[in-house]
């Protein structure tokens, strides 16, 4: 990247000099053409820490895979015994396996990189007089960048405008406290200014903790301060710290250092410390099987008194190969890559592959309300003004102030709206509003950072937080928009919204030189700062009436804010005016009820969670009544539970109530609350910890800077892609591109589908290995004329079954659609993973009988209908005496192939019969449905069909059959094959029937009642009984 040449360090230069040196314009920014030219000149805004996906590393992992190592040894032994054909076939399969594995894993790595870019930090940049969000990698020197609370600074900036702006620079300086920035600060040219004291700069990767700012980008990529640190770390280039020679016990520490380094890189080369937990488990499995293969080879040699001839070596090769599922890792990589793509299609970006595996095991979802369960497009629905009464807005377009109607009702302070709604009368907002409305409208517009503008085409375009947009649109209805008011009011000072105190305030000066504070925030937090209302002292009864009105509005599902104002004396220095002074002795103006309607799909998604045994908790900063109304509407709280019901006391809590409970008190509850209102960031962390102590597997949503601790604490952290801060996205495991609660449920469903499919193809692959091992181990007993064992299956036959017959159907199983009951079952246990007891039992049962029917096929043909003459040298060559052996081998090969293909269809469902895979009532069953279930997965159907057809060329094509596969053509033996395959099919169906009879439907969740059906308000049930019925039913047995 080209170094940027400027006359002086930018922190010494004033704003105008920086603007001219970088040939930019603060109001307009660079033009798009100039930005493109500078991108070509200076390069992308990236650190050079990661070279991206390394092809040779991916290739090395394929070669050093345990599965591949066994094949390489087998090829070497084959060439060593001068069996060139067999060695050549094994070598070809090695090349094929490495090629397929390399292509799929490389594509998967590239896909992961591209998906990460989708969730990469964005920068808000002014170019050609328009501010847009662009990929931060496209920033160039001279760009004008706009920052707000929660942003990660995308490059090094010379600040040109700051409003209560602070950044966290702990990453650079180690300073734990945020640094207050000042765009207009200047320094003397010869002054030594440390990095942390350059308060007119904002550094790349620092976090905006407060306020907003604008700055000119002066350094990108490796030219930034963080880039300099990265360069220094690269020069050190050490994963482990080598001890210094003058350290005590230097020699012992040096030996430990070498041991750690060697161990790390050996494990890395072998794949034991890379990849996801499942990939690491399967890699460990591969090496275990490799060890078993060596043991089996030793058993073969021991059976021949360690007199190792060529035939003994070939038999050892066969047995070693039979235990290895050569295509397992490749099929897993393909399945994971497909899972990522499917997730992205369902608006979920997977940032960490571990989350892809874990989603299916989620037991609890802790979700925010605004924009996730609800639409995130708010409208001002109700307003209560003590000096007037009520205003009500009805509209179909949240962003258009010219659409909809405004109605009003003059009422006494103690009147309740719901008793007098019929008396409301329409108000024409285009007329000059009443004096009673002016403080309300000014506060809505001026204490506001949003913009509401109409384009030349008549379209209304809004920017900002939904709550502020709703207030701004409301004031705009009365022609009191912020742009209109700024003509007669001058901005002085802002006290930004703080999640701890839950309020915001601004100070403006009008044309008469009068300074006014406008404040908005949570009702309790504004009310505690108010001393008057409507010109009179605010007494305790007045406060109680305001709270009562707030609860009335909140009971309608409205988010209620309070507005306040006061005239303030001119300060000597506005920047040093304490917030407590500005926000004291306020005059209460009004309550504003804002409505954020639930998304249409939220209710169905919550119901689906209940059926899937997933508990949904809503953690929101809203008022308890607002949270309760929305929770009831979407089904988190059953609609028939009234507000007076005693069970509501544990269903809905405030953050302060929950925080007041000790861990012991929380753990003594049989169920955690469904809704936490007024929830602070630390409350979310406490909730997750409480769930973890109950052995729950938690998904947590978040969008703000303060949500990052809870996102990291959760098993699966979910950030919002549209409204989430960069810090939250960085702390998350997955990102929702549409901020929609139903997308979380979609992700869990996809996670369950993928988990089921991995279990399917793992079972399918390992069953054939178990069967082949049993066949070949027992086959050691079949001795020829020179007392050497004759294998019932040749090495090439085994490789064909494992690579061709099994691999492609296994890939098809990885593409299986979700079962109809995938969201009717309890979450799986992530600690156990795919190697559950049921899978191991099925593998042994199916594998054992595959070995039995294969062995019986061999025995029947050789000893039942044949002569039983095993002749000699039949493991290596064909001659007339080996005809029976080669025919029996063909039949065994056909039986193993067709049984493997039957298993590929049978494992589509672990319990249901092949004739009714989806388990529909038999009265609705028909043959068309049966055929549909067989061919609905087209890739699997074609893979099975082609694998079945491939048996015949291998048996009947001359040279290939006898010289390569070590078998020959058969005739009447097909009858034995058919009977053996039928026996295996019936055996599988009988075992499935036994499984169904042993399986408790309640454990499957098939008949589990939903939350709404489970709750009852019978007075006989105590609170704990009700909690128990609600939640403990859905826990694992």
Swiss-Prot record:
Main location: membrane
Glycosylation sites: 869
Amino acids binding ATP: 370, 468, 520, 559, 620-622, 678, 684, 706
Induction summary: Induced in conditions of high pH and in the presence of sodium and potassium ions. Induced by manganese ions. May be induced by calcium ions.
One Gene Ontology MF term: P-type potassium:proton transporter activity
Modified residues (Phosphoserine): 1012
Extracellular topological domain residue ranges: 83, 303-313, 782-787, 866-889, 961-969
Cofactor: Mg(2+)
Lipid bilayer topology: Multi-pass membrane protein
Record protein name field: Sodium/potassium exporting P-type ATPase cta3
Organism: Schizosaccharomyces pombe (strain 972 / ATCC 24843)
Record gene name: cta3
């Amino acid at each position: 990247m080209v170094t940027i040449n400027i006359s002086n360090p930018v922190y010494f230069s004033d704003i105008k000099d920086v603007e001219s040196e970088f040939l930019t314009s603060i109001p307009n920014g660079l033009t798009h053409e100039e930005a493109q030219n500078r991108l070509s000149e200076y390069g992308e805004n990236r650190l050079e820490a990661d070279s991206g996906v390394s092809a040779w590393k991916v290739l090395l992992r394929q070669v050093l895979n345990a599965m591949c190592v066994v094949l390489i040894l087998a090829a070497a032994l084959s060439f060593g015994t001068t069996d060139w054909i067999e060695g050549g076939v094994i070598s070809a399969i090695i090349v094929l396996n490495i090629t397929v594995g390399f292509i799929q894993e490389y594509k998967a790595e590239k896909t992961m990189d591209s998906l990460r870019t989708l969730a990469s930090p964005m920068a808000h940049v002014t170019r050609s007089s328009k501010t847009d969000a662009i990929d931060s990698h496209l920033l160039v020197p001279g760009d004008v960048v706009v920052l707000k609370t929660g942003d990660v600074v995308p490059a090094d900036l010379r600040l040109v405008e700051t409003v209560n702006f602070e950044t966290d620079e702990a990453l650079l300086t180690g300073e734990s406290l945020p640094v207050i920035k000042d765009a207009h600060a200047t320094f003397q040219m010869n002054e030594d200014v440390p990095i942390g004291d350059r308060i007119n700069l904002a550094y790349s990767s620092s976090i905006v903790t407060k306020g907003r700012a604008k700055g000119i980008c002066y350094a990108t990529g490796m030219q930034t301060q963080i880039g300099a640190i990265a360069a220094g770390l690269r020069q050190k280039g050490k994963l482990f710290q080598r001890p210094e020679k003058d350290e005590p016990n230097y020699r012992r520490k040096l030996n430990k250092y070498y041991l750690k380094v060697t161990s790390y890189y050996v494990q890395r080369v072998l794949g034991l410390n890379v990849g996801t937990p499942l990939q690491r488990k399967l890699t460990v499995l591969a090496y275990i099987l490799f060890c078993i293969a060596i043991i089996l080879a030793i058993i073969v040699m021991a059976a021949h008194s360690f007199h190792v001839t060529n035939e003994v070596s070939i038999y050892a090769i066969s047995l070693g190969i039979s235990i290895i599922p050569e295509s397992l890792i490749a099929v897993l990589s393909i399945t994971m890559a497909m899972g990522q793509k499917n997730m992205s299609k369902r608006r979920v970006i997977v940032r960490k592959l571990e989350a892809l595996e874990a989603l299916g095991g989620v037991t609890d979802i802790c979700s925010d309300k605004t924009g996730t369960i609800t639409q995130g497009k708010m409208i001002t629905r109700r307003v209560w003004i003590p000096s007037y009464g009520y205003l009500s807005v009805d509209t179909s377009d949240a962003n258009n102030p010219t659409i909809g109607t405004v109605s009003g009702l003059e009422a006494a302070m103690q009147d309740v709206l719901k008793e007098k709604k019929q008396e409301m009368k329409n108000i024409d907002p285009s007329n000059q509003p009443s004096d009673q409305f002016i403080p309300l409208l000014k506060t809505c517009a001026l204490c506001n950072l949003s913009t509401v503008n109409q384009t030349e085409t008549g379209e209304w375009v809004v920017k900002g937080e939904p709550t502020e947009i709703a207030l701004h649109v409301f004031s705009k209805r009365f022609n009191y928009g912020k742009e209109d008011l700024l003509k007669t009011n001058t901005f002085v000072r802002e006290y930004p919204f703080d999640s701890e105190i839950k309020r915001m305030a601004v100070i403006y000066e009008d044309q008469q030189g009068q300074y006014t504070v406008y404040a908005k925030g949570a009702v309790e937090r504004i009310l505690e700062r108010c001393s008057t209302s409507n010109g009179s002292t605010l007494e305790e009864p007045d406060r109680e009436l305001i709270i009562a009105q707030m609860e009335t509005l909140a009971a309608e599902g409205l988010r209620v804010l309070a507005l306040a104002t006061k005239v303030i004396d001119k300060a000597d220095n506005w920047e040093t005016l304490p917030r407590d002074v500005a926000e004291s002795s306020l005059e209460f103006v009004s309550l504003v009820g804002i409505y954020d309607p639930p998304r249409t799909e939220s209710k169905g998604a919550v119901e689906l969670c209940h059926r899937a045994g997933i508990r949904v908790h809503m953690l929101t900063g809203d008022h308890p009544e607002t949270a309760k109304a929305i929770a009831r509407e979407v089904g988190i709280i059953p609609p028939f539970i009234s507000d007076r019901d005693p069970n509501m006391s544990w269903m809905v809590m405030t953050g302060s109530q929950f925080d007041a409970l000790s861990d012991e008190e929380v753990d003594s509850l049989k169920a955690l609350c469904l809704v936490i209102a007024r929830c602070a960031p630390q409350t979310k962390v406490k909730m997750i910890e409480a769930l973890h102590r109950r052995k729950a597997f938690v998904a947590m949503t978040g969008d703000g800077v303060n949500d990052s601790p809870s996102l990291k604490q959760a098993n699966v952290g979910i950030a919002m892609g549209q409204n989430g801060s960069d810090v939250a996205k960085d702390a998350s495991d997955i990102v929702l591109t549409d901020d929609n609660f139903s997308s979380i449920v979609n992700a869990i469903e996809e996670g369950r589908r993928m988990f089921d499919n991995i279990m399917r193809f793992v079972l399918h692959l390992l069953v054939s290995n178990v069967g082949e091992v049993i066949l070949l181990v027992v086959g050691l007993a079949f001795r020829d004329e020179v007392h050497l064992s004759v294998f019932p299956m040749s090495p090439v036959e085994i490789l064909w079954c494992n690579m061709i017959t099994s691999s492609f159907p296994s890939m098809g199983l990885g593409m299986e659609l979700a079962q109809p009951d995938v969201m009717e079952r309890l979450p799986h246990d992530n600690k156990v993973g795919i190697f559950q007891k049921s899978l191991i039992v099925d593998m042994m049962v199916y594998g054992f009988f595959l070995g039995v029917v294969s062995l019986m096929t061999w025995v029947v043909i050789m000893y039942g209908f044949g002569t039983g003459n095993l002749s000699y040298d039949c493991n290596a060559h064909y001659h007339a005496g080996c005809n029976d052996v080669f025919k029996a081998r063909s039949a065994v090969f056909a039986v193993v192939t067709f049984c493997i293909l039957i298993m590929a269809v049978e494992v589509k469902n672990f319990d249901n019969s092949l004739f009714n895979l989806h388990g529909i009532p038999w009265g609705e069953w028909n043959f068309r449905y049966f055929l549909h279930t067989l061919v609905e997965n087209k890739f699997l159907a074609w893979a099975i069909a082609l694998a079945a057809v491939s048996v015949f060329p291998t048996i009947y094509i001359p040279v290939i059959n006898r010289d390569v596969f070590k078998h020959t053509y058969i005739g009447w033996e097909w009858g034995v094959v058919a009977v053996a395959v039928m026996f295996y099919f019936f055996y599988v169906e009988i075992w499935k029937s036994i499984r169904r009879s042993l399986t408790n439907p309640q454990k499957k969740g098939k008949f589990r009642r939903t939350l709404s059906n489970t709750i009852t308000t019978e007075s006989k049930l105590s609170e704990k009984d009700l909690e128990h019925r609600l939640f403990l039913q859905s826990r694992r047995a």
